[in-house]
Amino acid sequence: MKTCFIDSKDSHHFVHSFPCVLAIGFFDGVHRGHQKVIQTAVKIAQEKNLKVGVMTFSPHPREVIGKEKVERLSTFSQKEALIREFGVDYLYVVAFNRNVQRLPPELFVKDYILRLQAKHVVVGFDFTYGAFGKGNVHRLREDGGYSFDVTVIDKIEHSKLKVSSTFIRKSLGEGKLERVTSCLGYHYKTIGFLHYIDESKLVFNNHQNMLPKSGEYEAIVKYGDYSFHTNIYCENFLNNVYVSHFHFFPVPSKEEPIEIQWLHRISANTLQPFEPFIVNL
């Protein structure tokens, strides 16, 4: 998969694009609903003998439109890796700024979708685009001058509630990891890096992933070639995660990412009766 960063409507990536089936969305967490969109695009591309493209945005549109910080379910590298697993040929990352925000819907389609040579577009049922979100799935084909087909993916539900990144963030905030895992289709993961060492405590820093509700969790901790299954203690309000049993492994370097796979919540306890391995996320 080739990742292409498009920072303006004059990007050279438009010149070097290929006719494709294009899946569009922010895809934070690449949850089951997102997976259905991408899988459908891949299937259609195979049937039509076309390339598969995925268009996403950076930063999150809400951070530009509403100037609000959106807690991420996945870092960009995590999202990129998850999308790559579906056999996508091109990941197009559009720099979402005020100029993109203000584009009328038909101009967004012309300047981005058509210039990427989309022959078929796949989106979720609630996809919107263009200034004030006026563009929607009902007018997408018309805005493209009927030059591409459109497939709209209906909502995926969990216990009769729509699976969405917002719903997953809410579930994380409630510590409902089983629900999170069901909606994602995999165990939620966060990434941290070594910040400093204090006696037997290792402190890690990361501000890109959302932490679940404070409490005790069963988890798998990975770094380098090492992996261990343990209980961890999360203090959400301090952005701290305490992990035990690290002393059997070498201390990771400051450049080495520490991955935590969150399996399930054990209790509301955040007290650590041991010398902890601390990850500040």
Model feature map: region roles:
Residues 31, 83, 121, 180, ...:
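Residue-level signal for inorganic ion chemistry
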